[in-house]
């Protein structure tokens, strides 16, 4: 594949120098910014993540800062999640939908104050959507992209590494909660979260100038922990059932189709509520399922049709071989008629038809 041409439109990150020194082998573009995809190999990176600790440049998870007297009003309008239950130190997974109930993004919200939230984005320009709603409604709120770049520390030794840099207080942070902890005299939001199921943290680095000092401090502190540079790993992600916006779900899908119905609990009249009413009552006609694909498969770069008796009954959005489980793991959007565990069908890959079986759930 051709390389990515350097441009101001494709932004480097505060950690890019460290990523390059660590020998990054591949990038993708995410929110107009570089996101590393592989260092050694997908398989080796995955095995290391599951045993040791990695530092991930996920600065591409850009923040939308929503601040002002009407910040909560806007948050309640753009997401079906009940925001009134959010604690002061909490992070919330907040699907955002359009007027038809289609997914626009699935960010993590960080509550900084009663009138100030960050939305940590998946791949999509949600800032413009929020700004447009705020202007149209005349809300008293400021919406900007702040100089905040997340750095993730993931893996079973993440607590040990983080404690060496931020102190033992990190061990007390609960899942999807955060503390403000000091680094070089600057308090940073440190949350127990991340795009893996290996455990770890995301550090919201305020100020690009702190990027490399923090990167270097983590590597200096973790030499005996076998710390390495890493990145979200597609094998571990699919095994874990972590959905990728743009791959496993798009604006053509609703939260209910994505298995996110439990996050549609707002009593407010949010954008898209009327459109989602039927699915809220009766459930969706299709939904995300874990799948096993037989045979050898190529890289999944496009949606692969799922077929049964010559009729399309869904599609595969992500698929890859799992060395740990010895099968091709996949995430698919499957029609109700064929989503029961054990149901067999076929998938049309670029290399031909392959057998597919629906699983009870994901691998972890």
Swiss-Prot record:
Domain of life: Bacteria
Gene3D superfamilies, sorted: Probable tRNA modification gtpase trme, domain 1 (3.30.1360.120)
Expression induction or repression: By dimethylsulfoniopropionate (DMSP) and acrylate.
Pfam families: GCV_T (PF01571), GCV_T_C (PF08669)
Chemical reaction(s) catalysed: S,S-dimethyl-beta-propiothetin + (6S)-5,6,7,8-tetrahydrofolate = 3-(methylsulfanyl)propanoate + (6S)-5-methyl-5,6,7,8-tetrahydrofolate + H(+)
Keywords per UniProt: Methyltransferase, Transferase
GO molecular function, one term: methyltransferase activity
RNA-binding recorded as keyword: no
Annotated GO biological process: methylation
Cysteine pairings via disulfide bonds: none
EC numbers on record: 2.1.1.269
Further details from the record: DMSP is used as an intracellular osmolyte, predator deterrent and antioxidant.
The name this protein goes by in its record: Dimethylsulfoniopropionate demethylase DmdA
Annotated source species: Ruegeria pomeroyi (strain ATCC 700808 / DSM 15171 / DSS-3)
Gene label: dmdA
């Amino acid at each position: 594949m051709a390389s990515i041409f350097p441009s101001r439109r494709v932004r480097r990150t505060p950690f890019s120098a460290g990523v390059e020194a660590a020998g990054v082998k591949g990038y993708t573009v995410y929110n107009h910014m570089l996101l590393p995809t592989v260092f050694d190999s997908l398989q080796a990176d995955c095995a290391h993540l599951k045993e040791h600790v990695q530092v991930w440049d996920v600065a591409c998870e850009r923040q939308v800062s929503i601040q002002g007297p009407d910040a909560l009003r806007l948050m309640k309008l753009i997401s079906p999640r009940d925001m009134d239950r959010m604690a002061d130190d909490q992070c919330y997974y907040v699907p955002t939908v359009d007027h038809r109930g289609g997914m626009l993004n699935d960010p993590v919200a960080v509550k900084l104050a009663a009138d100030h939230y960050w939305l940590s984005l998946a791949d999509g320009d949600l800032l413009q959507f929020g700004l447009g709603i705020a202007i149209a409604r005349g809300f008293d709120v400021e919406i900007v992209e702040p100089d905040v770049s997340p750095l993730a520390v993931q893996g079973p030794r993440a607590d040990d590494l983080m404690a060496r840099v931020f102190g033992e207080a990190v061990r007390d942070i609960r899942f999807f909660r955060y503390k403000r902890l000091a680094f070089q005299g600057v308090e940073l939001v440190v949350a127990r979260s991340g795009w893996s199921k290996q455990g770890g943290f995301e550090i919201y680095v305020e100020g690009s100038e702190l990027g490399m000092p923090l990167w270097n401090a983590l590597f200096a502190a973790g030499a005996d922990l076998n710390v390495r540079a890493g990145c979200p790993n597609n094998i571990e992600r699919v095994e874990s059932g972590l959905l990728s916006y743009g791959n496993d779900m798009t604006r053509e899908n609703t939260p209910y189709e994505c298995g996110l119905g439990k996050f549609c609990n707002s009593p407010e009249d949010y954008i898209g509520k009327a459109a989602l009413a039927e699915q809220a009552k009766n459930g969706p006609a299709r939904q995300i399922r874990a799948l096993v694909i037989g045979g050898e498969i190529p890289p999944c770069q496009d949606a692969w049709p799922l077929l049964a008796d010559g009729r399309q009954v869904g599609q595969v959005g992500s698929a890859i071989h799992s060395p740990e489980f010895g099968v091709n793991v996949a995430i698919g959007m499957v029609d109700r008629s064929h989503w029961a565990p054990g149901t067999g069908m076929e998938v049309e890959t670029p290399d031909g038809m392959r057998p597919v079986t629906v699983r009870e759930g994901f691998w972890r």
